[in-house]
Swiss-Prot record:
Signal peptide: none
Similarity field: Belongs to the FKBP-type PPIase family. FKBP3/4 subfamily.
Identification of the protein by name: FK506-binding protein 4
Compositional bias ranges of the Basic and acidic residues kind: 268-291, 319-332
Organism (species): Aspergillus oryzae (strain ATCC 42149 / RIB 40) (Yellow koji mold)
Pfam families named among the record's database cross-references: FKBP_C, NPL
GO MF annotation list: peptidyl-prolyl cis-trans isomerase activity
Record bears the keyword Isomerase: yes
Principal EC category: isomerase
Length: 470
């Protein structure tokens, strides 16, 4: 099951063996990713040999299955609901009251458990078996009863209450100051932590929320360019489809009788001449062709006669016009005789496509492996630019530890040390719309330092997309 982190989880478990609830109300799902001790903390040798090396052992304690608050909470809720229906002055009601009733019950049970544990500490001489008292206290907490008593302990012993207690890790001040963990506790699961030894253990992680992989919104059919879900298989398929589209334009080259054929020639293409006037239509062919007079001389068309009048009767201008017309006919493209194929656009009508930036493929830059999946367009990102990114961060085993796929994009100033060095190297040279995979070695990422979800000396892999350059 995939989960998404939503908030930071932190818990302090002091030494001494006291049971600490993982969460106060057990109404949230969380994941523990790190356990650590403070090396500067003074060790607590109470009951321990001072000659031994200071250390702390973390244990997780789970209540037996079947002992939960759901049944009692439902009964309590029905009682509260019936009271509210009889009270006309109460304005509020509905599902939220059930949660309030359960939280109040759990807080009262926690307080009773603490009081029971305090009584056990004061009465250590009379009862040396403190673990059994803790079991009774937990039973009261889970079932929502009063403080643990001797008679209750007998009842619990008869019922055979057994706690699942497991060792998680042992930390010391010399070699093992911290330990990466991956423990996920589901909602409503009753879990406790306790520490035996000389140091307090600090637990960190995230509250998480399950992700339903089968959920599809109504607006998913609409394409959103800012949404980013880079899957290597889908990207490679998209590149293949783009390559097929490019090849389709070459199929026109196989026509037997094209209307326009290219001629290899060193002649320069004719220059376009601006014409004045609103009437841009070409004159009919019969008007352009001068008819021969009876004496063998060519007669001027009406259009040519008008031009002759504008030139004050200068006949030399007509001759120059004829020579210019003959020069236009010597074009770089020749028309075929068979025009049955219909009109086709000439090469001059095609608009030049916007140039892409970079080249596809894998390359290595300053120790960072870069695999361009899609080339962007426009200027390339350089040091000093502020860039807006979408990204998915993974470990080598494919486990996702961070992502920005929707909402506000991640922005930073390139080359200024605002991100890990591998990002400054890997994002440089991208253009808007470009997508690439960046493989960053540990020394250009977080090195030996371990972070939540990222063990020390980890190689990081990022699938990134550049949305904007400022």
């Amino acid at each position: 099951m995939s989960v998404q982190p939503v908030a930071v989880y932190a818990l302090k478990v002091p030494a001494g063996g006291a049971l600490i609830p993982a969460v106060p109300d057990a109404a949230a799902m969380f994941r523990v990713s790190m356990a650590a001790i403070d090396p500067d903390e003074e060790p607590d040798f109470d009951g321990h040999d001072t000659n031994q090396r200071p250390r702390a052992t973390l244990r997780i304690v789970r209540a037996p299955p079947g002992l939960d608050l759901e049944d009692d909470s439902d009964d309590d809720y029905e009682d509260v609901d019936s009271d509210e229906e009889s009270d006309d002055e109460e304005p509020n009601g509905g599902p939220s009251d059930k949660e309030k009733a359960r939280k109040l019950k759990e807080l009262a049970a926690l307080k009773e458990m603490e009081e029971a544990m305090d009584e056990d500490d004061e009465d250590e001489d009379e009862d040396e078996d403190g673990e059994f008292d803790l079991k009774a206290a937990i039973s009261k907490l889970v079932k929502g009863k009063g403080p643990a008593t001797d008679s209750d302990e007998d009842d619990e012993e008869d019922e055979g209450l057994e706690l699942d207690e497991m060792v998680v890790c042992t930390l010391d001040t010399e070699k093992n100051l911290q330990q990466p963990l991956d423990i996920t506790v589901s909602e409503d699961e009753r879990v406790f932590f306790k520490v035996t030894g000389t140091h307090t253990v600090y637990l960190t992680g995230n509250y998480v929320m399950p992700i339903d992989p089968h959920f599809h919104g109504e607006d998913e059919d609409e394409e959103d360019e800012d949404d980013y879900d880079l899957s290597p298989d889908e990207d490679e398929l998209a590149l293949d489809l783009m390559g097929d589209d490019d090849n389709e334009s070459d199929e026109l080259d196989g026509l037997e009788n094209p209307r326009i054929t290219e001629v290899d020639s060193d002649e320069e293409p004719p220059k376009l001449v601006d014409t004045k006037g609103k009437n841009k239509r070409s004159a009919p062919a019969d008007e352009e062709k001068p008819a021969k007079q009876a004496n063998g001389e060519e007669s001027l068309s009406k259009k040519q006669q008008k031009k002759l009048k504008k030139n004050n009767g200068d006949a030399a201008a007509v001759e120059q016009k004829k020579e210019a017309k003959e020069g236009k006919e010597a074009k770089k493209v020749q028309f075929a005789k068979n025009l049955e194929q219909g009109p086709t656009p000439s090469g001059q009508d095609k608009k030049p496509a916007e140039q892409t930036t970079g080249t596809l493929g894998v390359k290595e830059v300053k120790g960072v492996k870069i695999d361009d999946k899609k080339l962007g367009k426009g200027p390339a990102a350089k040091a000093g630019n502020t860039v807006a990114m979408r990204y998915i961060g993974k470990l080598e085993d494919g486990k996702v530890f961070d992502a920005n796929k929707k909402g506000k994009p991640f922005t930073f100033k390139l080359g200024k040390g605002e991100v890990i060095k591998g990002w400054d190297i890997g994002v440089a040279g991208m253009a808007v719309g470009g997508e690439r995979r960046i493989s960053i070695p540990p020394h250009l990422a977080y090195g030996k330092k371990a972070l939540p979800g990222i063990p020390g000396n980890s190689k990081l892999i990022f699938d990134v997309k550049l949305l904007e350059i400022k």
